[in-house]
Amino acid sequence: MHLSPQEKDKLLIVTAALLAERRLNRGVKLNHPEAMAWLSFLVLEGARDGQTVAELMQAGTTWLRRDQVMEGVPELVEEVQIEAVFPDGTKLVTLHDPIR
């Protein structure tokens, strides 16, 4: 199987996001890389499911709460930008202050 660098990056995001999901389900607080992977994964999957950029930007502020991440993580994650594939092409999705 031959994967492009972008495809490899997406697989790494998925792997880290699955770990983050397991930790969230166990009540373990996420660190910075896990939080970034989880938010990125939800954007990528939402785009594949047909949600719009605006819908993802709005929903992105509800996916993680301060009590689900380690201390200091919300301040580190002021903005998340990820390119996602939508039915009408690739677009940049930006989440502003996603952990509230």
UniProtKB/Swiss-Prot annotation:
Catalytic activity: urea + 2 H2O + H(+) = hydrogencarbonate + 2 NH4(+)
Assembly, per entry: Heterotrimer of UreA (gamma), UreB (beta) and UreC (alpha) subunits. Three heterotrimers associate to form the active enzyme.
CDD domains xrefs: Urease_gamma
EC assignment: 3.5.1.5
Family affiliation: Belongs to the urease gamma subunit family.
Organism: Synechococcus sp. (strain CC9902)
Localization per record: Cytoplasm
The protein's annotated pathway: Nitrogen metabolism; urea degradation; CO(2) and NH(3) from urea (urease route): step 1/1
Recorded GO CC terms: cytoplasm
Enzyme class: hydrolase
GO molecular-function terms, A-Z: nickel cation binding; urease activity
UniProt keyword list: Cytoplasm, Hydrolase
A GO BP entry: urea catabolic process
InterPro entries for the chain: Urease_gamma, Urease_gamma/gamma-beta_su, Urease_gamma_sf, Urease_subunit
Stored NCBIfam families: PRK13241.1, urease_gam
Major localization class: cytoplasm
Full protein name: Urease subunit gamma
